[in-house]
């Protein structure tokens, strides 16, 4: 059976195009991909094959969902969609719940600055941080950006 990737969407206007891009890239690498909103995926968790869940944030509101996904044998990777701007340690501490971070398999950083900042703030979890960029930015670059040049 193919590896399964679940791309969880909370805000279709902001996330759909970048998730489609990720789905295409993952499919090219042999993954089976499911795109859906968080509520529907959670409702169906008992019926889904275990896989890798890509989520957009790990704030305290996501603790229950992350626990549920882990109970069913899934891996969880995350990116913070709003973390492009830093507002200091206190702000980041509200966006990244320590318990959620402890259950993550990987956290994807937009760049070196975020990576170093998180390593300093959460040294215990430094092996979970990876610099990947953000697919929302990737689709704005050539050759994928033709749609956005007109806008």
What are the roles of these predicted feature ranges?
Residues 3-149:
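Active-site and donor-binding regions of nucleotide-sugar-utilizing enzymes
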